[in-house]
Amino acid sequence: MIPSFKSTTQARGALAEDRALAHLQRHGLQPVVRNYRCKGGEIDLVMRAPDGTLVFIEVRQRSASAFGGAAASVTPAKQRRVVLAALHYLSTLAQQPPCRFDVVALAPGRLEWLQHAFDLDTAGEAG
C-alpha cells in the first residue's frame, strides 16, 4: 500500500525521516515511536541508544543552505515544542530513562547528525 500524503512537503518530510531513521539504525539506535504528537508539540523520531538513553530526534531538510540550512531551522520555538512533546511522552512511562535531544539535518547529498543539539535547560533560548 502506498502512503497517502496531503502535500508534496509532507512526502518530502517522510522521505527525510526515512533517511534519518536508516542512518541512526546503522549507528545502533533502535526505533521506539515515529511522529509522536500531543497538544502543543510533535517529535519526528523517538529512538533508544545502545546505552538505554531515550533520544528525541527532530529531522529537518532543506534544499539549500540559505538562511543557515536545515540545522538552523530548529528555532527556539521549535525546540520548546519538541521538549513539550518529550515531557508528555516521558509522563506516559513508568520509569524515566536518561534522555537527550538530537537533530538530523539533511541537505542534498549530506546528512548531519547533531547529538545533544539542545536540552531541557537550554531549549527555547535564543542563540
UniProtKB/Swiss-Prot annotation:
Pfam families registered for this protein in UniProt: UPF0102
Lineage: superkingdom: Bacteria
InterPro entries reported in the protein's UniProt record: Restrct_endonuc-II-like (IPR011335), tRNA_endonuc-like_dom_sf (IPR011856), UPF0102_YraN-like (IPR003509)
GO molecular-function terms, A-Z: nucleic acid binding
Similarity comment text for this entry: Belongs to the UPF0102 family.
Name of the protein: UPF0102 protein Reut_A3265
